[in-house]
Each structure stands twice: as C-alpha cells, then as structure tokens.
Curated annotation (Swiss-Prot):
Induction: Expressed under control of sigma-A RNA polymerase.
Name the record gives this protein: Exo-glucosaminidase LytG
Keywords: Cell wall, Cell wall biogenesis/degradation, Glycosidase, Hydrolase, Magnesium, Secreted, Signal
Cellular-component GO terms for this entry: extracellular region
Protein's organism: Bacillus subtilis (strain 168)
Activity's dependence on pH: Optimal pH is about 5.7.
Entry function: Is the major glucosaminidase responsible for peptidoglycan structural determination during vegetative growth. Catalyzes the hydrolysis of 1,4-beta-linkages between N-acetyl-D-glucosamine and N-acetylmuramic acid residues in peptidoglycan. Acts processively from the ends of the glycan strands. Also plays a role in motility, chemotaxis and cell division.
Signal peptide extent: 1-29
Family: Belongs to the glycosyl hydrolase 73 family.
Length: 282
C-alpha cells in the first residue's frame, strides 16, 4: 500500500514538471520577444529660437551695410510673418508684409488695415521673393531708398540709436497702420533679447556657393555655429547627403569656419565647413 502511494506521488510530481516546465519556457519566450521599453525623453527643439538664429546672422550682415538694427529686422519678421508661418511667408517668402511687386512678382492676398481708427479687411498685392534672405535684403533697401514720393521717409529708422527709437520711427514714418505697432515691436525685442544682435559682426560674410554634404560627414547641423552660446542641434549632416545645397553665409572664428546653407531656397542651418564639398563655378 505504501509503495502504491509512493508511485502515485512520483507520478504526480512528474506530471507537474512535465506541465510547468514547458509553461515556464513559453512565458519566458513570450517576455523576451517583446521589445524592451526604455524611458527616453525626447528633446524638443525651440522652433522660435531656431527662427531667430536663422535670421540673426544675415540681419547683422545687413546692419553693417544699411544700418538697419538687427533687433528691428528680426522683431518685424516675427510680428509680420508669425515666426515665418504666415500664408504670405509660405507662398511668397515675404517676411515683412511689403506690398507691391518685386522684379515683376507678387501674390494677391487679404490683409487687415486700420483706417480712421477702424479695422477693415482688404485685398492687396504683396511682393514675392525667392528666399527669406531676399525678403530681408529688400526690406533693408526699402528703408534706405524710401518711397517714390518720399526718398527720406524712413531716414529716422536708420538714424535711431536703439531699438525703441527705431520702433517709434517705424510708427511715425507710417510703415504700418496699427496704432500699437511700435509697442509690439519693442515688446518682442525685449522678450527675446534681440538687442544683443545690435552690433556689427565682422566674422560674418554673405556668400553664394553651390555645394554638397560629404558622404563621410559625421557632423551635425545646428541653428547657429555650435561654438556660439545657446546653439541648438537640429539634425545629422547625413540627412542631406546626396542633395545639392546652397551656402549663403560664412562665419569664421579663429581656425573654425561654419557655413549656413539652404536647400531648394529653404534655410536649413549651420554646419562645420569640413563636412561640405564646395563645387567649382562653371
């Protein structure tokens, strides 16, 4: 009797292992087949600062040439184009709401105007540009050449000693019909510390070079040279291998040289010159 009980117990133990071991192996295999989730914070890119960085260098180049304060140029671009996101900026690369034709090109769009204290919507022609930089160039030249009926219309803007004086001059010169225009421009300058760009930067040059990213490039693309304070990493240079690029700005600091480039007339960012292959002019 004792032997029968012992045999029965051994049988039950054997059955237990026969069932439990495959089940355990199945659970283990199922667990291992699932991807291991690692907690990872996605680094958010400050698109507003990237927009400022993309324009600040060229704004300083124009300041040296035309004496339009960079803080005013950038603040107007922010206000008029909604950080480059407006329909006018998207369709015509027009950052400043400049009306009329540019070299025979324009778009017709609705716009709000204030007349005799009342706001109304009208349809008007706006200048169409190939690039944001072309829009900035024309904006600076507008202040220099004035209008057909008043060549000195914007002279007070050029003579302003600081952004507050320049913003007031914009208002009194009739650049915009918004009665709060000067206050809005000054507020943007102060919020984003744009007056830090109000100086000539001899390390910056405007260039026009056809180029490509080297296949072996391991560098990153930045919102401005990575050696500058608060520069933002945008992507890897490998993202643009095989694409034609246009180098539009050059910055040299000691032995370090950086290029700002665009693709299909769209600004991309800054990259170390060692990642770039300049094509010879044909």
């Amino acid at each position: 009797m004792a032997r029968k009980k012992l045999k029965k117990r051994k049988l039950l133990i054997s059955l237990f292992f026969l069932v439990s071991i495959p089940l355990a192996l199945f659970v283990l295999a199922t667990t291992l087949s699932k991807p291991i989730e690692i907690s990872k914070e996605t680094e958010e890119i400050d698109e507003q600062q990237v927009f400022i960085d993309s324009l600040s260098g060229h704004a300083q180049i124009l300041y040296e040439k035309y004496h339009v304060l960079p803080s005013i140029t950038i603040a107007q671009a922010i206000l008029e184009s909604d950080w480059g996101n407006s329909e006018l900026a998207a369709k015509a690369n027009n950052l400043f709401g400049v009306k009329g034709n540019y070299k025979g090109h324009h778009v017709t769009m609705e716009t709000d105007e204030v007349e005799k204290g009342k706001r109304k919507t009208i349809r008007a022609k706006f200048r169409k540009y190939s690039t944001f930089f072309e829009s900035m160039d024309d904006h600076a030249q507008l202040f220099v050449r004035g209008t057909s009926w008043n060549k000195k219309k914007y002279k007070p803007v050029l003579e302003a000693g600081n952004y507050k004086e320049a913003a007031t001059a914009l208002q009194t010169s009739g650049y915009a019909t918004d009665p709060d225009y000067a206050d809005k421009i000054s507020a943007i300058v102060e919020k984003y510390d744009l007056d830090e760009y109000d100086e000539v930067n001899p390390s910056l040059k405007s260039v026009d070079l056809n180029a490509s990213i080297k296949d072996s490039a391991v560098q990153d693309v930045w919102s401005k040279p990575s050696t500058d304070d608060r520069s933002i990493r945008l992507t890897s240079a490998q993202s643009y291998v095989g694409k034609d690029i246009k180098v539009v700005s050059k910055k040299q600091k000691g032995q370090s040289v950086w290029y700002q480039f665009q693709i299909n007339d769209k600004l991309i960012g800054w990259i170390d010159d060692s990642a770039v292959e300049i094509k010879e002019a044909t």
